[in-house]
């Protein structure tokens, strides 16, 4: 069960009748750098933009969830046209925080006071529940972390990219940098959140940065990460080869491997075999997304146990290139296993 202490803060951004967008309140606190990033993400600072009702992402190891609404009558908010509720947390669980934020939005629309929102926030922190007759209720134990991790659809990813999904699988297995572009943030969030499922054995969603702007503070934050899945709505990201090993153009269904990653990402018989396996599993109408993820994970564990068995015979259970050569693998397979051993920290340096 997700624990209430995972929430870090609650914030409120308003756009007034003069079209000014400002931070108006937060509890207990949000630092200035994060506030600046949240203003950029909330869509209220942009002119003539479509309203993005819910976005999420990660900055400096903090997850943020932003729900934005247009003020509707009847309301006590006479000078406000739109507002965004910002929740920051330690955990990845978009559905949980979207549901909680909807309750907070209704509360603020009705009362026009952050105090009422703070009461709801504290109730969830202390009791795991926030109840109200007119604004709806929220129960934290309804939102299981595993469900959040499984909510992205790998079957959709495979149906779009087919055999090329093996490029994404290889990149994630080797902890490479994957950049995904789509002009529509909703499509970007839906696609990117599914990719860590390809490496389910790690259950590591900290690699996910689904909504990044081409701004220095965000790019510097990204560059300190070893490998990642980063989503961008700006088409100029395709020219930023310093940011990616693999570039995914979602609208055009194209995947490109950058020049500097081609050696580590070279494909062979093993890749073809895994690629076929992934496609067959995903195309089976009787199999759910969760079953497809499990199938791929079992296949991955087979590969890793083969690596481990080689390492068992080696010095300190660490692999060397010489150990791998004893397996007499084809060059592309040997190359992949060598880079995989490095990614899994099984390599003797």
Curated annotation (Swiss-Prot):
<keyword id="KW-0967">Endosome</keyword>
<dbReference type="InterPro" id="IPR042431">
    <property type="entry name" value="FAM45"/>
</dbReference>
<dbReference type="GO" id="GO:2000641">
    <property type="term" value="P:regulation of early endosome to late endosome transport"/>
</dbReference>
<protein>
    <recommendedName>
        <fullName>DENN domain-containing protein 10</fullName>
    </recommendedName>
</protein>
<comment type="similarity">
    <text>Belongs to the DENND10 family.</text>
</comment>
<dbReference type="InterPro" id="IPR037516">
    <property type="entry name" value="Tripartite_DENN"/>
</dbReference>
<dbReference type="GO" id="GO:0031267">
    <property type="term" value="F:small GTPase binding"/>
</dbReference>
<comment type="function">
    <text>Guanine nucleotide exchange factor (GEF) which may be involved in the regulation of late endocytic pathway homeostasis, including endosomal positioning, maturation and secretion.</text>
</comment>
<keyword id="KW-0344">Guanine-nucleotide releasing factor</keyword>
<dbReference type="Pfam" id="PF08616">
    <property type="entry name" value="SPA"/>
</dbReference>
<feature type="domain" description="uDENN">
    <location>
        <begin position="1"/>
        <end position="135"/>
    </location>
</feature>
<dbReference type="GO" id="GO:0005085">
    <property type="term" value="F:guanyl-nucleotide exchange factor activity"/>
</dbReference>
<dbReference type="GO" id="GO:0032509">
    <property type="term" value="P:endosome transport via multivesicular body sorting pathway"/>
</dbReference>
<dbReference type="GO" id="GO:0005770">
    <property type="term" value="C:late endosome"/>
</dbReference>
<dbReference type="GO" id="GO:0015031">
    <property type="term" value="P:protein transport"/>
</dbReference>
<feature type="domain" description="cDENN">
    <location>
        <begin position="160"/>
        <end position="294"/>
    </location>
</feature>
<feature type="domain" description="dDENN">
    <location>
        <begin position="296"/>
        <end position="349"/>
    </location>
</feature>
């Amino acid at each position: 069960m997700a624990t209430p202490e995972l929430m870090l803060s609650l914030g409120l951004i308003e756009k007034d009748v003069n079209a000014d967008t400002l931070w108006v309140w937060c509890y207990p606190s949000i630092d200035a750098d994060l506030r600046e990033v949240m203003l950029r993400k909330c869509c209220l600072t942009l002119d003539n933009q479509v309203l993005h009702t819910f976005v999420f992402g990660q900055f400096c190891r903090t997850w943020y969830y932003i729900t934005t609404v247009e003020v509707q009558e009847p309301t006590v908010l006479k000078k406000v046209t739109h507002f965004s509720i910002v929740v920051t947390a330690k955990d990845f669980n978009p559905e949980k925080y979207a549901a909680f934020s909807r309750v907070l939005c209704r509360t603020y629309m009705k009362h026009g006071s952050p105090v009422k929102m703070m009461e709801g926030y504290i109730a969830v922190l202390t009791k795991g529940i926030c109840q109200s007759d007119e604004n709806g209720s929220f129960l934290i134990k309804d939102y299981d972390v595993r469900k959040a991790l499984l909510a992205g659809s790998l079957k959709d990813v495979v149906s779009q990219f087919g055999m090329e999904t093996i490029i994404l699988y290889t990149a994630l297995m080797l902890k490479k940098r994957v950049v995904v572009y789509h002009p529509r943030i909703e499509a970007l969030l839906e696609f990117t959140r599914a990719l860590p499922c390809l490496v389910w054995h790690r259950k590591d969603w900290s690699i996910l940065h689904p909504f990044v702007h081409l701004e220095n503070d965000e790019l510097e934050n990204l560059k300190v990460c070893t490998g990642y899945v980063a989503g961008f709505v700006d088409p100029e990201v395709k020219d930023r080869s310093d940011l990616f090993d693999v570039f995914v153009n979602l609208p055009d269904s194209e995947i490109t491997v950058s020049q500097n990653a081609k050696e580590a990402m070279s494909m062979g018989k093993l890749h073809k075999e895994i690629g076929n396996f992934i496609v067959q599993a995903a195309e089976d109408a009787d199999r759910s997304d969760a079953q497809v993820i499990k199938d791929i994970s079992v296949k991955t564990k087979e590969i890793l146990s083969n690596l481990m068995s080689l390492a068992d015979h080696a010095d300190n259970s660490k692999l060397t290139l010489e150990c791998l050569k004893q397996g007499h693998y084809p060059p592309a397979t040997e190359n992949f296993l060598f880079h995989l051993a490095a990614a899994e920290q099984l390599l003797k340096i």
